[in-house]
């Protein structure tokens, strides 16, 4: 038999069972405080060091000794993120937390796990209504309203959801791990093809490229400057009349018009930008050691901070697109680069062009490209299906939590 329901008066909650109430978060705790900024020099990988919540998805460790004694987490605390993703943590006791975290000292009678489930739904409604909101203040958290059943029913709901969510999380973890394995497989398939070819019966010879070992006997090794020319054409056409191109480590070369939204600094004009033609290779000199290199499928312009290379005769740019995005070639870029920190590690044009690469006959380059296009497409389609499954399962998990913490569905008594 379905329960008698009533309107809660709260948009995200909707109707609740007649015997339930609603309550603001501010009435469930006895006070709030923020943590302390802890310098990265005190961050640690030692498993025996103190846990430190940083507003990331999981805590890290710290050996910092001067965290105020009264701020260490206690058994009845919840931690709430102030910035970024609005995570809600049930912390381990005696943990530290950054000043980007709010600690709420919960009332002794409160079921923290039920509150966590309810707050997750409540704060999600704020995210949907205000996607640009960057800060989750104490005032905002205190205003959150959740549905409030009896203590006994809260306990039943928590036990039910903990079991269901643990199973869902296990499936999600396995699926994410399988995606990483497919990515590794793709990288292995590419590396094998661009360094060994796709003919199993060919004779091989030693390679002078450190990470390759052996290459097919008919292949050569040649410096990049001997197969690609440095393109230095500048653009002076107004921004609104050009095809603006960007380079991403994961995605390669993308047209701005194909992006749903652009992040970071936006160009205000394209004067002095570098011209790019179809089949050119674009290189980010700062991040090429992380794979920020790619072929352009388009004519357009790109940032003057990037290098642009055009292929010479008997060079298939797509072959080198695959080759340049291997981890082996990334290590070549790193060895030739220099800088004061990893994210500012530059492989300048002269150093990049001096790197030796394999050089198969053009016919083989094209055969390898055709082979890799097919294989990579197969792997990418499998990954897309798994990502879609993850999206659906995460949506199901959120719906499941919502239905039970608002009383739309009832956990049976046993």
Task: Please report, for each region that a protein language model flagged, where it lies by residue.
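Amphipathic alpha-helical coiled-coil/heptad-repeat segments
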Residues: 1-13, 19, 148-202, 359-414
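Non-catalytic DNA-recognition/assembly elements of restriction-modification systems
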Residues: 3-36, 52, 147, 151, ...
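DNA target-recognition patches
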Residues: 5, 26-64, 74-80, 225, ...
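Short, solvent-exposed loop/turn positions at domain surfaces
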Residues: 10, 66-67, 130, 173, ...
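Short, well-ordered beta-strand elements within core beta-sheets of diverse protein domains
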Residues: 11-15, 102-106, 142-148, 210-214, ...
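Short, solvent-exposed alpha-helical surface patches in well-structured domains
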Residues: 27, 114-117, 143, 153-156, ...
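Hydrophobic aliphatic residues
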Residues: 29-32, 119, 161, 228, ...
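A short beta-sheet element
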Residues: 58, 66-124, 129-132, 137-141, ...
């Amino acid at each position: 038999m379905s329960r008698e329901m009533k309107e809660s008066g709260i948009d995200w909650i909707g109707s609740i069972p007649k015997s339930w109430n609603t309550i603001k978060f501010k009435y469930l705790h006895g006070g709030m405080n923020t943590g302390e900024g802890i310098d990265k020099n005190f961050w640690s990988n030692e498993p025996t060091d103190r846990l430190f919540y940083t507003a990331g998805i999981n805590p890290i460790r710290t050996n910092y000794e001067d965290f105020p004694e009264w701020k260490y987490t206690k058994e009845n605390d919840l931690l709430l993120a102030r910035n970024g993703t609005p995570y809600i943590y049930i912390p381990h006791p005696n943990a530290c937390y950054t000043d980007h975290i709010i600690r709420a000292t919960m009332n002794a009678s409160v079921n923290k796990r039920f509150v966590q489930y309810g707050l997750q739904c409540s704060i999600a409604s704020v995210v949907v209504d205000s996607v640009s909101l960057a800060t989750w203040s104490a005032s905002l958290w205190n205003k959150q309203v959740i549905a409030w059943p009896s203590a006994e029913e809260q306990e039943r709901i928590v036990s039910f959801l903990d079991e269901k969510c643990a199973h869902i999380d296990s499936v999600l973890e396995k699926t994410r791990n399988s995606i990483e394995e497919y990515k590794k497989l793709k990288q292995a398939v590419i590396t094998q093809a661009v360094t060994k070819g796709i003919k199993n019966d060919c004779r091989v010879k030693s390679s002078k490229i450190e990470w390759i070992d052996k290459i097919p006997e008919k292949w050569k090794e040649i410096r990049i400057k001997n197969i690609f020319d440095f393109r230095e054409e500048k653009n002076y056409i107004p921004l609104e009349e050009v095809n603006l191109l960007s380079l991403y480590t994961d995605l390669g070369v993308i047209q701005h018009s194909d992006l749903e939204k652009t992040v970071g600094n936006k160009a205000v004009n394209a004067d002095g930008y570098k011209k790019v033609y179809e089949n050119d290779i674009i290189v980010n000199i700062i991040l090429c050691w992380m794979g920020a290199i790619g072929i352009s499928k388009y004519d357009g312009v790109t940032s003057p901070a990037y290098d642009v290379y055009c292929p010479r005769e008997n060079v298939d740019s797509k072959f080198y697109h695959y080759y340049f995005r291997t981890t082996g070639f990334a290590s070549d870029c790193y060895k030739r680069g220099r800088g004061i920190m990893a994210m500012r590690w530059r492989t300048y044009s002269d150093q990049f062009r001096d790197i030796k690469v394999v050089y198969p006959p053009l016919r083989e380059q094209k055969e390898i490209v055709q082979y890799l296009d097919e294989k990579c497409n197969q792997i990418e389609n499998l990954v897309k299906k798994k990502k879609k499954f993850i999206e659906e399962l995460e949506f199901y998990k959120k719906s499941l939590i919502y239905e039970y913490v608002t009383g739309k569905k009832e956990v049976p008594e046993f």
